[in-house]
A protein has these predicted regions:
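Pre-Walker A (Motif I) flank of P-loop NTPase domains
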Residues: 1-4, 76-77
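NTP-dependent small-molecule kinase module
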Residues: 4, 16, 20, 115, ...
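P-loop (Walker A) phosphate-binding loop of NTP-binding proteins
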Residues: 9
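Conserved glycine(s) of the Walker
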Residues: 13
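Post-Walker A helix-loop "phosphate-sensing" segment adjacent to the P-loop in P-loop NTPases
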Residues: 23-31
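ATP-dependent small-molecule kinase phosphotransfer cores
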Residues: 35-87, 91-98, 125, 138
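Short glycine-rich anion-binding loops that position phosphate/pyrophosphate groups of nucleotides
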Residues: 84-88, 109-111, 161
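A glycine- and Lys/Arg-enriched "phosphate-lid" helix/loop adjacent to the NTP-binding pocket
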Residues: 99-145
C-alpha cells in the first residue's frame, strides 16, 4: 500500500498534517478529497448538500475516492489523502480506504475540535441545524468516533496541535 489516508472529524487537522506529510514525503501527491470532489463536479460541497442532500454528496464522494485509487493504480502514483470527516460513514468507502491505503485516524478531543472549528469555521454543512457547535460535535463524534477507530490502521493523537510531530509519527508508522 503506497497511499496514506488521513481520517478524523472536521477540525482534527487532516489538511495541516497532510501538508506536513507532503513536505516529508515529496514523492507523494497531497489530495484533499473535498477539493477533488468540487473540481470533479464543478460545484461546492455546500451547494451539493443544499441542492441534492447528504446522500448525493456521499455518493459523489465515493466516486471521487474510487477515481483517485484507480488513477493511482494505473499511473503508479502514491497519494496522501486528506479525507472528509464523514467519508467513513460509507461502508464502501471504509473498505476502499483500508484496502488501498495505510489509514491514520487523527484523534482529537471534543475541546480541541470545538476550538479548531471556532478558529477556522469554514462552510461546514454537517454542523448546521440550530444546535450549539459543541453539542453538534459531540453528537456526530458519538456516531463517528467508533467508525474512525475501526477504519484506521493507526491512531494519532493530535490534541497538542503539533502537526509536524503527527506527520513524523505517521512516516515512522507507515
Amino acid at each position: 500500500m503506497d497511499h496514506i489516508s488521513l481520517i478524523g472529524f472536521m477540525g482534527s487537522g487532516k489538511s495541516s498534517v497532510g501538508k506536513e506529510l507532503a513536505k516529508l514525503l515529496p514523492s507523494m501527491e497531497l489530495i484533499d478529497l473535498d477539493s477533488y470532489s468540487e473540481a470533479m463536479t464543478g460545484r461546492t460541497i455546500p451547494e451539493i448538500f443544499e441542492n441534492e442532500g447528504e446522500a448525493a454528496f456521499r455518493e459523489m464522494e465515493k466516486s471521487a475516492l474510487q477515481d483517485i485509487f484507480m488513477t493511482g493504480e494505473l499511473t503508479g502514483a502514491s497519494y496522501i489523502l486528506s479525507l472528509g470527516g464523514g467519508t467513513v460513514t460509507s461502508e464502501a468507502c471504509r473498505r476502499m480506504i483500508r484496502r488501498n491505503s495505510t489509514c491514520f485516524y487523527l484523534k482529537a478531543s471534543i475541546d480541541t475540535l470545538v476550538h479548531n472549528l471556532e478558529t477556522w469555521p469554514g462552510d461546514r454543512p454537517m454542523l448546521k441545524g440550530g444546535k450549539s457547535l459543541r453539542s453538534r460535535v459531540e453528537e456526530l463524534m458519538t456516531a463517528r468516533g467508533p467508525i474512525y477507530e475501526k477504519t484506521a490502521h493507526h491512531i494519532i493523537n493530535v490534541d497538542g496541535d503539533d502537526y509536524t510531530a503527527a506527520a513524523v509519527d505517521i512516516v515512522t508508522l507507515k
